[in-house]
Amino acid sequence: MLEGPILAVSRQTSSVAGIPGASTRYSFAKIDAPIEVPGLLDLQRESFAWLVGAPEWRARMQAEAGEGVRVTSGLEDILEELSPIEDYSENMSLTLSEPRFDDMKTSIDEAKEKDINYAAPLYVTAEFTNAQSGEIKSQTVFIGDFPMMTDKGTFIINGTERVVVSQLVRSPGVYFDESIDTSTERPLHGVKVIPSRGAWLEFDVDKRDTVGVRIDRKRRQPVTVLLKALGLTTQEITDRFGFSEIMMSTLEKDGVENTDEALLEIYRKQRPGESPTRDSAQALLENSFFRPKRYDLAKVGRYKVNRKLGLGGDTDGTMTLTEEDILTTIEYLVRLHAGERTMTSPEGVEIPIEVDDIDHFGNRRLRTVGELIQNQVRVGLSRMERVVRERMTTQDAESITPTSLINVRPVSAAIREFFGTSQLSQFMDQNNSLSGLTHKRRLNALGPGGLSRERAGLEVRDVHPSHYGRMCPIETPEGPNIGLIGSLSSYARVNPFGFIETPYRRVVDGQITDEVEYFTADEEDRHVIAQANTPFDADMKFTEDQIEVRLRGGDVEVVPASQVDYMDVSPRQMVSVATAMIPFLEHDDANRALMGANMQRQAVPLLRAEAPYVGTGIEQRAAYDAGDLIIAPKAGVVEYVSADYITIMDDEGIRDTFMLRKFERTNQGTSYNQKPLVNQGDRVEAGQVIADGPGTDNGEMALGKNLLVAFMPWEGHNYEDAIILSQRMVEEDVLTSIHIEEYEIDARDTKLGPEEITRDIPNVGEDVLADLDERGIVRIGADVRDGDILVGKVTPKGETELTPEERLLRAIFGEKAREVRDTSMKVPHGETGKVIGVRVFSREDDDDLAAGVNEMVRVYVAQKRKIQDGDKLAGRHGNKGVVGKILPQEDMPFLPDGTPVDIILNTHGVPRRMNIGQVLEVHLGWLAKAGWQVDTNSDDPKIKAMLETLPEDLYDVPADSLTSTPVFDGASNAELSGLLRSSRPDRDGIRLVDDFGKAQLIDGRTGEPYEHPISVGYMYMLKLHHLVDEKIHARSTGPYSMITQQPLGGKAQFGGQRFGEMEVWAMQAYGAAYTLQELLTIKSDDVVGRVKVYEAIVKGENIPDPGIPESFKVLLKELQSLCLNVEVLAADGTPMELSSDDDDELESANAALGINLQRDERPDADIDVG
């Protein structure tokens, strides 16, 4: 029943090392990773598969757990936790079990088109038991539509694609800390027992050497009061803690004799003002820590407590606190305060005594998608539980059925609220394939139950040694979220407790094995770990006796080879996917690398994608896992190929058809388009890429273009990161992208009658309607520009008293003469493009529309945006800049063979930013384009040095090859230096670039060679989403604010440019009185004056004198509202009356000119301007 949707959470193949039909990349890597990168979307998929209990997940878990062990899904766990729901007398109970899903209601495309959820109906079995009569009634109950994950790890909510981001939170457990007392400068110690849900329990030793306890953040009291309340006698406390002076002195001073007194004392502190009884005090303590419904450590909390305190026992055991937990915690605390280093646990285990580092990844865990949704379902079910209890008491016991008890609305509301409004359910970043992939692998420390931006200090944001191989130290946003939002490292995975694990290769006595083990951060701390690039010989033995290793806390030391336990599996283990796509990362400053990783996510997919000459080897894997490619599931032969679909006949004789998505709009307005890579008759293998997605080239991530770059200043036009481009980029559409905008209009019922979508619009000429069809909707293929009508719509006006003439016209022409106003949807200011799609939804066609809406039309307009001055370009090393000038090809500097360069970058952009990786990329880019052939018999010392490390398959590389230089394991300086000496000459036998990567360039304007050789080569440049077309804005007349009558601000409101306080000072300083007066009155908020000026300009008269600005009148009203009597005096000292006599004059002027400069301030209101 569930086969369809659960394919959505199937595990992706872990190995794509040998993708059939993939491009060849010549790799400089020296280290072969023993394992492939795990599925990059497993973080999302596996978690959701656990939540819904996908069949593939269940089968795999059952195989791992062994026969006879029950495997439960997240939804089953939560129903078991809730059941049974009993009434107050415990005579009746309701049990929920066996969650299951029916088939999907809609396809993914249908959900997007109709603005609905991609969801499957969820059913559970509800069993009602009446203990008095022994009657059991069982029914299947529909709980609601449950949003399902697509095969790309996303959800479709109300037609838009969303991602649920994993949350980094402090793990439940027991945490010891140390602080220094400011007065005595002595260390004080404390401990917090933090549950998954329930009251916090805190113990501490204060400066007077007493041990205290706080329950649920209330007032502190002696710890022995709590111990006596738990039933311990003074003698038992002395037997357990007799070794500790501070515990004995606390016991003497606590002032309670027995359990009853202790319970009452705790109750008074917890509930001041209420009269305590022994029973209520006992219930309060029980409820706080020992009732599973009120206190839950969760499996992870129990695991952490048992590990820290050396308690044995099963992690599936008690989820509440036990008396032993509390006693061992107090013993650990007093021994820590006494300066002891180890203790023996009650189980007889020797455990170390140390304070905890809250920022350590052993103490921070991930709440992944499944757990976040599970928590939300728990909230909904607990609300439902209250309703069930009430109905059990109010309904007749005989007639009760499970369906009459259950109200499913709280559950579906909780799920809907989470997906729609939670901080962790985010609008998917679909700028390109990489941005979507990175968004799904994001780790967020913010959100409900997490940190807040304002309170997060430096420590929690900083890079921690335990992040190694788990969270990328480089990829994080700039700005207020720095360090709070991260990205999962490339080899990391999440274990069932939510801790992030990273893999290591086992080493035995200096011998490296192929055995790989995954460790959490606190397990890793116990081992001695070597780097991935530690040299070893063909027999997998270390070649050096002393090895550089990482010890606990990130310390680096040198130890004998025999002491090494493990080594890293790959040099790119510590970085995320986006960071691993930066070649020569090891030569870039971290700040610039951060910008490089972030800016790749902002790259716009170009018209024709082109894979980078200089890659890192992860491009293919990233594109494959991002889910935007079409991959052949089985081997076969291509029967038919068109732009819209591909048909393959597989080897078993079954025909498969793959539909391609063409020019769809993404969340960010970029174009999502798939292109076939195969031809009719081609043989394809299983796993082969048969169609490219946006920003991919032959199955590899391809976000930019390889451009011929020269590093030189050019007449100051590339000062301060400005970029000079060749006109070829514009003419040949090298940096051209397609952007798609969606416009929506609906026809509603109004008080005066229904709105109507029509071609019959009042006061509009036939030329304006030329591109509209008979329904009044623009035709597909029409070229439109700002102001053009996309959909004609009329709205009824208020009926006024008709004159006899109008009544006569009504009688003759019928409805035609009725009063309607034009409310058509027009192309917004500054937008142009071609109409590529129209969708019409109407009530008549049984489309699901909002209340009061009769018809809705969506129009898609595509723009082809060529590169232009003001657009932002960037490399992969944080080297960003704005296009300052586009030069004709003939003016660009050119190489001796006549090739003009494509782009000129300023040399000053390199040294102080310390991103030298871009220079090395330029040299290797040139080598990849030219090719190279190494003379193995050369006496050149540079070539000899290179041959020591260069892999043999790189001795002879043809021109126009793709290379890969993996992070921390790429081409060395010696290799680049040797290869520059071995590059292939051009067809004239000339090597255009010398041994230092420099060329003799010639000035395109004069034909004179430049004085010095210039670094020239190929760099991969990205066009970022910061396009000047979306930012440029100008206003003549437009909407005004209702209160101040000043123009609104911002492009979205079609606002003006603010002439602020400092600009006014500048005008005053220059004595430009008339200009200033004009700016502050008729150009702004002199309501009457601005209409008169408009009139004077239209009639060709002189500009009249300005009046009084509206904001001055607002100021007066403000002062009067504070009960201040304010008078305005004329020049002669007589009081002036600021009346609104001008209103009539204003209206008549407006009517005469046919303009209306009043407008609602809301951005969604219709702009109605002159």
Curated annotation (Swiss-Prot):
Give the enzyme's EC designation.
Answer: 2.7.7.6
GO cellular component terms, semicolon-separated: DNA-directed RNA polymerase complex
InterPro entries, from UniProt?
DNA-dir_RNA_pol_bsu_ext_1_sf, DNA-dir_RNA_pol_bsu_external_1, DNA-dir_RNA_pol_su2, DNA-dir_RNAP_su2_dom, DNA-dir_RNAP_su2_hyb_sf, RNA_pol_bsu_bac, RNA_pol_bsu_CS, RNA_pol_bsu_protrusion
Q: Which GO terms describe its biological process?
A: DNA-templated transcription
State one Pfam family annotation: RNA_pol_Rpb2_6
Supply the enzyme class, top level: transferase
Keyword annotations for this protein, in alphabetical order, are: DNA-directed RNA polymerase, Nucleotidyltransferase, Transcription, Transferase
Q: Which reaction does it catalyse?
A: RNA(n) + a ribonucleoside 5'-triphosphate = RNA(n+1) + diphosphate
Instruction: List, alphabetically, the SUPFAM superfamilies matched.
Output: beta and beta-prime subunits of DNA dependent RNA-polymerase (SSF64484)
- Any one GO molecular-function label of the UniProt entry: DNA-directed RNA polymerase activity
Subunit composition and interactions: The RNAP catalytic core consists of 2 alpha, 1 beta, 1 beta' and 1 omega subunit. When a sigma factor is associated with the core the holoenzyme is formed, which can initiate transcription.
What function does the entry list? DNA-dependent RNA polymerase catalyzes the transcription of DNA into RNA using the four ribonucleoside triphosphates as substrates.
The record ties this protein, via PANTHER family, to: DNA-DIRECTED RNA POLYMERASE I SUBUNIT 2
Give the UniProt family note: Belongs to the RNA polymerase beta chain family.
Any idea what this protein is called? Answer: DNA-directed RNA polymerase subunit beta
- Origin organism of this chain? Corynebacterium urealyticum (strain ATCC 43042 / DSM 7109)
Gene, per the UniProt record = rpoB
